[in-house]
């Protein structure tokens, strides 16, 4: 049986989609799912996303920041956009590709003190983890 492809998309493939990829690789059966992430642009892996995930016991430091690959997009089983910009500007997908939007705040745009910015990253990390755990348990 071939794996199903789950493709997480956001604007820059630096924070939210990277964290989602890391969590999905942790919570989903790797024999059943091929988990990928990409962005409308490739902004590079955000060091705070790596740090936040490491704090939670998930290593995403070897993941790469990539632009959307049309072949992966058009053959994915499920495409999940994680920000409104990606949802609005994501290329059209064929009818057989299921698309969902799971919106999360952008931790890279957090303002305030360093502590407040870090708390923002932690909150978004945990929200993404909860959403992916729910998907792993229910398929929804």
Curated annotation (Swiss-Prot):
What Pfam families does this protein map onto?
LMWPc (PF01451)
> Which residues are named in the active-site annotation?
10, 83, 90
> Where does it live in the cell?
Cytoplasm
InterPro entries with a match to the protein in the record? Arsenate_reductase_ArsC, Ptyr_pPase, Ptyr_pPase_sf
Does the keyword section mention Disulfide bond?
A: yes
- Set out the biological process GO terms recorded for this chain's protein: response to arsenic-containing substance
Q: What is its EC number?
A: 1.20.4.4
Question: What would be one Gene Ontology cellular-component term for the protein?
Answer: cytoplasm
Give the matching Gene3D superfamilies. Answer: 3.40.50.2300
Catalytic reaction annotation: arsenate + [thioredoxin]-dithiol + H(+) = arsenite + [thioredoxin]-disulfide + H2O
The superkingdom listed in its UniProt entry is: Bacteria
**What is this protein's function?**
Catalyzes the reduction of arsenate [As(V)] to arsenite [As(III)].
UniProt-listed HAMAP family:
Arsenate_reduct
The similarity comment for this entry is:
Belongs to the low molecular weight phosphotyrosine protein phosphatase family. Thioredoxin-coupled ArsC subfamily.
Q: What is this protein called?
A: Arsenate reductase
Q: Which organism is it from?
A: Priestia megaterium (strain DSM 319 / IMG 1521) (Bacillus megaterium)
Q: Which gene encodes it?
A: arsC
């Amino acid at each position: 049986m071939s794996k199903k492809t789950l493709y997480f998309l956001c604007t820059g493939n630096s924070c939210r989609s990277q964290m989602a990829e890391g969590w999905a690789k942790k919570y989903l059966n790797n024999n059943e799912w091929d988990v990928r992430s990409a962005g409308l642009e490739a902004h590079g892996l955000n060091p705070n996303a790596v740090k936040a995930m490491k704090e939670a016991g998930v290593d995403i430091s070897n993941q790469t920041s990539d632009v959307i690959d049309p072949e992966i997009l058009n053959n994915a089983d499920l495409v999940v956009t994680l920000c409104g910009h990606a949802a609005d500007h994501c290329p059209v997908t064929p009818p057989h590709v299921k698309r969902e939007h799971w919106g999360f705040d952008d931790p890279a745009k957090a303002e305030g003190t360093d502590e407040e910015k870090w708390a923002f990253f932690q909150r978004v990390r945990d929200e993404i983890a909860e959403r992916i755990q729910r998907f792993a348990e229910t398929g929804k």
